[in-house]
Amino acid sequence: MKHNPMTAKSQIFPNHRSSRPPADLLEGIQVVDDRFLELIDRHTVIEKHWTGCEWAEGPVYFPEGDYVLWSDVPNNRILKFDAQSKETTVFREPCNNTTGHYRDQQGRLVTCEHSANRISRTEPDGTIINLSLIHI
């Protein structure tokens, strides 16, 4: 079954009106697929908060702490951006070249670890639990 991006857009942003943002809004941003432009409100302010990732992937937002985690895969680290302080720090290094993250229903970080060939969960106390039963 082929995914229809327009259907997904209407379900995710039901009140969004598509309008191409002004060119200066996208300065320094590489747009690979023009459909991305349909998701940006023309009055949005885009701010760059970090440079220095070789390959960034897997952002996940934690609203209770108002921060975002993401992977810098080749540099083997997870970075953390604090929305209040506007500071980016290293959350975990090394991190087994994590490639993706999400939050489970209890708000814990679940991570795909490339070099360890596993899926892990980080407990509130920082303990890392292996969720994979079979290593490939």
Predicted regions located by residue number:
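Conserved beta-strand positions in repeat-built beta-propeller and related beta-rich domains
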Residues: 22-23, 51-52, 61-63, 68-74, ...
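A short beta-strand motif characteristic of beta-propeller blades
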Residues: 46-50, 87-92, 129-132
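Short coil turn/linker residues within repeat-based beta-strand modules
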Residues: 75, 85-87, 126
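Conserved small/polar residues in nucleotide/adenosyl-binding loops
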Residues: 134-136
